[in-house]
Structures are given as structure tokens and as C-alpha cells.
Amino acid sequence: MRTSWKLDHESLIGYGYTVKVIREIRTFIEAEVIKNGERTEIQWGADSAFRFFPLCEDEITGFTLHPIDLAANKLSALVGRTEPRDWIDVIESIKNIQPLVYLLSAACGKDPGFSPTSMLEYIARRRYNQLEIDECIIPAGVYNAAELCCFWREEVCRAREDVLDFPRDKAGTCVLNKDGEPFRGSVKELSVAVNTGDVIFHEGRICGAWPKII
């Protein structure tokens, strides 16, 4: 992580960006990057070697975590950290990756001290007002707090019902369809997919692995 930070920092400076370190600890660096009046925040972190998928190669950022691993990490962060960014990232993951109940299962695979139900009750309390969101999201006004809170409340209510029907012995796995893509159906549809063999409960491991498609 330190090597990546050093190289990225030098590259950004070389391209005329101003880099302001916001927070720095041994395994994590957060910096604000500014140029021509525009700014964004970038984070460098040292992640656990345990994950569901191998690292994904990206033309811009080099290597990144698979979206499901990122979403699982954000859920774990939301349990113990009060950052509006984490909450918004989880909401975006629900919208773009898969329903909350499946992301909870994956997150518990990385943090076995939780079950989907117990983790849900921790994160269900999270909500932020417009001022809190605008302070950490640049530019301000990108997200509407009222809309986010309504969406979050609905998803938490849905997940509370879903965890009751989710297979307990599969908690901690990543739920994929038969093609190895994130499963996005309802829990009732999951039950049907289990019976027809159209779902994969993919387990995490050191350095991750791609699911076996049969």
C-alpha cells in the first residue's frame, strides 16, 4: 500500500495536481486531490488477503477489489464507523450490485463475528442529514438526504424479512447466478434457483478465487 501511495502521489504531483493528506495511519491513507478548482478524495488501503474474488485489473487505478468485495468491506465499515460515505456506498451497492441480504451474507464471510441479522441491526440505525452529507461529498448537493433515507428505510425493512428466509448454512457466502454473476433475484427466487441448480454459493479464501461454472 505504501508503495502504491508513493507512486500515485508522485504521478499526481507530476500532472499538476495538489494532494492534501486528510488522514494517514499505517494501513490507510486518505487524500484530497485538487486541480483547476475541481477536487475529489482518494483512499489507499491495505486490505485483508481473505476475499471472494482475485483482484481486478483496472486501466486507470491498477488493481482493485471486485465490486462484491468492496461492498462487503463497506458494510463492515458501516458497523463501526460513522462516515456518510460508507452509508452512501452501501446504498449504491444495493442499487447496482445486488440486494442487501446477499451483501450482508458476503460481509459476514469477511467478519464471522456477525450473522446477517446481527450486522443488519447494527447498520439499520445509520442515517444522515443533508448537512452531514454535503460536508463529506464533493461537490455538495449531489445526493438528496431525504431520498437516501427513504430508500435506506425501505431496504432495511425488506432485508429484515429476507434474512428470515435466507439459508442459514449459506451465511458468509457470496451469492451468484449460474453464470458467476451477482444474484439479483428475491429470496423466493433464490429458493427456486437452489432447487434448479441455478445459483452458486461462493466461499471466500486467501487471495480470492473465481467460481467454478459447471
List the model feature ranges, each with a label.
Residues M1-I214:
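Compositionally biased terminal segments of proteins
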